[in-house]
Structures are given as C-alpha cells and as structure tokens.
C-alpha cells in the first residue's frame, strides 16, 4: 500500500518563464509536488500522519519555501481503489473508483481513458465478459499508476524515520524497479502490461 494519508495543498508565486517540468521534492515524512501553472505554482505536501503532525508539516513547508505560505486546509485520505468499477448496471468513474494520491492530471487521465474504453469497446456487447474485461482494464491501469507513484519514494533518502521505515517495508513494484535500474527494455508508448493502452509513465518519460 502507498505510505501517505494526508495532503497539505498550497500555492507559490511564479516569477519569470514557466518551467516545462514538475518538481517532486522529498520531505521529512513524504514529498511535495510543485507544478508550474498560469502565474503560480500549484503545490502540496503529501505525508504520513504516523511520522509527522499537521502543524509540524506546515512548519516544515514554511522552513523550505518561506514563512508567508498560506496552508488553510489539511486533507485526509486513504489510498486505494476498487477491484471492480462495473457491477450490473452501475459503472464507477473518477473518485467513485478510488483515490491514490492527489495527482489531478493522472486522475483525470484515468477517468477519460476508462470512459473511452467503455464507449469504444464494451457497450457494444454488454454482458459478463464485457464487465470482466472492463474491470480487468481498470485494475491494470491502477497498478501502473501505483507503479508511477512509487517512483516518488525511490530516491534513496534515509535521514528520517519515515524514509528508513519505508526502505525496510517497501519493495519497488516491477515497473518502478525497472526504471530505476536504467531501463531494462526499450520504452514504448503502448504498454502491453496495461492491456495495450497508454501508460502513466509513457515512452517520453524514459528520456528525461
């Protein structure tokens, strides 16, 4: 399971040209995303409440980014996803299917991909086989997203209790381990391990 259960969203000013990349910054008990958007950075600290309290997490952010950072809300969540999204006449989309970590673009991408799969492939033959195929697609898709998320925890940091505990308890999933080993296969856009559909870590990501 993924190790974090709290998110502390905030914004930072963006002066000058917008960078063409997102920063993922290791913190004492989790990591910060820093995404350049129009006129500012959208940021958030995701962390494990067993290792740091909400007030201490706010203090850590202010030490790193400045005392004026406004952080009015702490979001609590339990990471996971449903094994089935299509049961009888009910079909789940978006947060109804699960929540992994607050990666909005990845969540939107997964929702759209599920709808495309549903309408293009399975509505033409709405039977148990279509349900099973759609649920299998959903499972494979989220396994790849979990793989992608684990990359945020594979940086080698070991100077706090959170990171030491994570290293002892966590083994990188197959895809994450493969990427960290420098790429043991040629990257390709359509990943057969995701039923031939696009991966959340596509070929272009191997090049950066």
Task: Please identify what each model-predicted range represents.
Residues 31-33, 77, 86, 90, ...:
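Tryptophan-centered motif/residue detector
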């Amino acid at each position: 399971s993924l190790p974090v259960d709290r998110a502390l969203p905030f914004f930072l000013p963006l002066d000058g040209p917008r960078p063409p990349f997102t920063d993922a910054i290791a913190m004492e008990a989790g990591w910060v995303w820093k995404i350049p958007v129009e006129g500012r950075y959208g940021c958030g600290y995701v962390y494990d409440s067993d290792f740091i309290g909400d007030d201490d997490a706010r203090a850590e952010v202010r030490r790193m980014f400045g005392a004026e950072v406004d952080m009015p809300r702490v979001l609590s969540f339990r990471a996971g996803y449903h094994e089935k999204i299509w049961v009888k006449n009910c079909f789940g989309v978006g947060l109804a299917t699960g929540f992994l970590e607050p990666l909005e673009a990845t969540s939107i991408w997964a929702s759209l991909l599920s709808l495309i799969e549903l309408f293009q492939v399975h509505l033409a033959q709405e039977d148990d086989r279509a349900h099973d195929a759609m649920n299998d697609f959903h499972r494979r898709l989220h396994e790849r997203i979990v793989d992608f998320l684990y990359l945020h925890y594979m940086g080698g940091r070991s100077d706090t209790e959170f990171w030491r505990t994570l290293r002892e308890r966590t083994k990188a999933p197959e895809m994450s381990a493969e990427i960290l080993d420098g790429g043991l296969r040629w990257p390709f856009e359509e990943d057969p391990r995701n039923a031939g559909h696009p991966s959340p870590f596509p070929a272009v990501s191997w090049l950066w």
